[in-house]
């Protein structure tokens, strides 16, 4: 990267985009973020934004070179490095990712006939999107590269995930764009490190990166589903202890202990979506997605097993806390929260269910479930 080029643009500064912007600003870059939500932008401008994502409010209050705009032309013209971080949800009914917002952004860039820029897609896309659709949508942009650079982060720990990643995945449009992206991430690495030790970057084709992103997440979902399956087997086997069994399995260096714990089914905005998306993509290229279909089935089956176990306890009141989609997550994300789905099934079975959680999470639950449960706000 041209070491004198210090400006970076981010199109879409939602939860992930804002965290990226803050880390880039802390690494020494001048960052301009774009969004369409005027009120949200104003809170960022006056640094009054309240975020449940750890460290965001603190880093925002200390930032000096982060600005935001709702002027699309301004953010595009601000730099030659344009990151795009917009939602690509699964479109429902086991269909593919909804690339509508991303498509619209690329269409707008093409209508401006941008040139001499690097466009970097951060949001998750289906394999083949970059070169089959993305490049077509930017066909009028001269000397402009299209790159894929998905983040491997966890909601509720995004800043830490960006500052201390297991790896940086770069699906480079050209060697030059790959080098510039590597330079940018190395500056982020230096925020918490004095040398290059531990800096792991994987540069490859966009197609390889698209598959890698899904493959990593889906390996984790399979490991979680397998762990719960083994745990359920132990529960049905007198004399066995699921925690001892899983701990021993994790000692094998070929397997490792991460994500090898008994608990609730996996949920959230990414894991279920990516598992289904990889299965759907497999079918389009003629490979039967046996593993991903089985993982999804095991995950749902485990939820049903746990529900029956709770139901058989026949409690007077069923109390649940920590209702976000994963354990110890203070961010109000309840999408496909297994614990919440079990609570709903218990309530539907006529059981009294009390939800104890923080106000922000309870407010989110009430939006979807109303008075299905009784609630108690806790710290």
Per-region residue spans from a language model:
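Structural/interface elements that position substrates and couple domains in central-metabolism enzymes
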Residues: 2-379
